Amino acid sequence: MNFNSPISQAQEVGTDEPLRTRSGYKVVEAIKNFKAVLEQSGAQAAGKSLHHTADLVCSGCFFLWQKLLWEYAFDHVGIASPRIFHFLKKRFFEMDGAYTKLPAEQFYRSVEHQKNIAECLLLVRACPRRPPLKMPRVPPETHSGEWVRSSTGTAPPSVAVGRVFRQSHDLAILKRVGDEFAKSCGDGATERALFWMKWLFEEEMYLKKNKEGSLSAMDRGPPGWPAKSRRHVGFYLTAVLAEIYKDLAPKTGMRMHEEFQSLLNLYNFPDKNFTQKRRVDALCLCIQIVCEVPRWKVAAAPSLVTDPLALERAVGHAESFFREVLAFDPPVGNIEKEAKKGTRTTPSVAPMDAKKRKELALQQQLAAYDNMVDNWMGTN
């Protein structure tokens, strides 16, 4: 099969053009195209997503590609396949180690790493989909002392909260709200548990904004972090969730130990490529697990691989897609900085005819490559 791309080098279009990937896409277009095909099903979409993966990774966007996979996993998979988060965390950690040790081009040309990258992509694509969680609204009036006193204190004392709460370091409200939070988890009331999580986050923010301290003076966060960050209420919640899971697992037969621990670690020990929003998403998914999984018919995470032979065949095509992209020179410039500019583009006013012709020619070449991928995937 011929994987030679008809796309000409981006540098030939003109020096005043935006920075482009190795295959000739504008960076924002490459990201947009990848996100679009990631949400599509079928063999043709899988081929396109492999092409855009190879293009982004080999253009210097390896960490950006990871962020896009995390984004898809949290926004479109979630509780439908908790195993994918454990898998991605482990595989990304392994690949990050190799990426930092090896020269970039050597990493890109390694067949082993190409297959690992393709496997991550294909397994994410194969996951069942579930719409993202909707966060409940927390009205401002709920942060008044009167509302708190009238709305908490009715839940029975939680054993899990009792093992985490420290009277010498934590405000009493953490115990009262913690008991309400634990009761919500035990009742399977996901929305109510998310409400109390969000309430604690907002209460912490209000206290700091008004320079009234914080909800806790206990360092529960990772060593090496600033003291104020280590005392954030989010670490109190992860500790409570860990205790809730320990109590639930033997009672309900829940078997998600690795998945749950990986999600807790994504919040507690995030790497530099994991955004704050995704940390909160990981915490929300932990809440959803303890609320909903005990009520599943089989309280375990579904397997990621349903057809090992089909996955092996698909991963085997990775080398061809990477070879196609690596035939072009790497982009010159900071492509990750270009990617941060966002997807909004400002059309030029009255462009020159010559420039229009070059742009049209490039778009036709990109379309030709897409057709080539379509035709190839249609025969497999």
What are these model-predicted stretches?
Residues Q9, V13, T21-G24, Q44:
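Amphipathic, alpha-helical segments enriched in basic
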Residues S23, A30-V37, G42-D55:
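Conserved helicase/translocase motor-coupling segment
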Residues G14, L19, K48-H51, C58-N380:
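C-terminal alpha-helical interaction modules of replication/initiation AAA+ assemblies
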Residues M1-D16:
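Short, charge-rich, low-complexity alpha-helical interaction segments
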